[in-house]
Amino acid sequence: MRVWVPVGVLTSLAYCFHQRRVALAEQRAPNGQRPVDRNLLELKMVQVVFRHGARSPLKPLPLEEQVEWNPKLLEIPPQTRFDYTVTNLAGGPKPHSHYDTEYRKTTLRGGVLAGQLTKVGMQQMFALGEKLRKNYVEDIPFLSPVYNPQEVFIRSTNMFRNLESTRCLLAGLFQHQKGSAVIHTDEASSEVLYPNYQSCWVLKEKTRGRKKAAISQPGISEDLEKVKTGVGINNGDDVDFFVLLDNVAAEQVHSLLNCPALERFAQLIEQRAVDMALYVVEQEDRESIQMAVGPFLHILEGNLLKTVDPTTAPSKTRKMYLYATHDVTLLPMLLALGIFDQKWPPFAVDLTMELYQHQESKEWFVQLFYNGKEQVPRGCPDKLCPLDKFLNTMSVYSVSPEKYRTLCSKTRIVELGE
């Protein structure tokens, strides 16, 4: 692995490092005594958590004039092709996908099924893969230019749009190559890459109650009635700001938004969807965030700890971890890290954690990026965050499988109700 040292023979590489957002900076070290010379930082590990690419809506709006979703929207761009196989977490057969079975029950006008990755989404994910290739293959020699399972671990939720999004990302990251990548996924009953209402009854009950209460909040209820009336949706129809945003976002990204009223209300719809989400998942309600994404944060935390542990066998770590997730995963994660920007996580957005080690002091640092922008996580002094401080931030919401089971126990529903 290349060590970044400030000597003449590495001048061009140092320049690339500069171009890659980790240039020399007048940044104070944690003790405040000296700046951190970023030329002495060696990249050790990267974790990328991303939302799938653009897709068809999950549930159409009950409007007389329905948007037409032509099957041509699902055509696969040749450059995004990449062979992959799907296994369970233990390497066995791919689990059944309950969600995909449900999506097949809804056909949108034009013939496209609900929740399907589109050509636009495939191109978005390919572009994200190309960005990762530039950052970690071309600008610095961190990853091999071809897929190597000893370097990259890939996990996705067991939904076709996420598996296909991962395929497109891999095509952008590793280009065309022979051989197949392995994507790991889990049973719906134990999945932790999204808030799991199937395995966590307490979260399900709390979310149901708070979602119902959110809709009746002053301002939200009036705006919902205004939007529904404006676009011609009966107040009796089961449509909230989440359903509205799902359709607006999908139609906008495919240039299919042909309802002037929906277009006029688009910004309000997104803001109110965010307001509802923040009401449902309160930042002050530590347990709600723990139940939503705590087990996933525990996995990310574990990857960091394994990498910095000198006793960890090389076969137990990877240079890069890729996780295909959802907007409902990213939003509580951003809240947990203190970097939520008050905007709904867009299609193909990524949250990237880079782990560095200083070659002289041997100190560890984390640099966090969301949607391509450097972030300062809660509890961190600056964008380059000492690992211990970053872990302290994660530990507030990270939960072990045992703690998760305790939090989600059905017996706690009665306790909380009392």
Swiss-Prot record:
Residues 51-161 are annotated as: Substrate binding. PROSITE patterns: HIS_ACID_PHOSPHAT_1 (PS00616). It catalyses: a phosphate monoester + H2O = an alcohol + phosphate; 1-(9Z-octadecenoyl)-sn-glycero-3-phosphate + H2O = 1-(9Z-octadecenoyl)-sn-glycerol + phosphate. This is Lysophosphatidic acid phosphatase type 6. Its EC number is 3.1.3.2. Hydrolyzes lysophosphatidic acid (LPA) containing a medium length fatty acid chain to the corresponding monoacylglycerol. Has highest activity with lysophosphatidic acid containing myristate (C14:0), monounsaturated oleate (C18:1) or palmitate (C16:0), and lower activity with C18:0 and C6:0 lysophosphatidic acid. GO terms for biological process: hematopoietic progenitor cell differentiation; lysobisphosphatidic acid metabolic process. InterPro entries: Acid_Pase_AS, His_Pase_clade-2, His_PPase_superfam, Histidine_acid_phosphatase. Monomer. The active site is at H52, D327. The gene is Acp6. Its main location: mitochondrion.
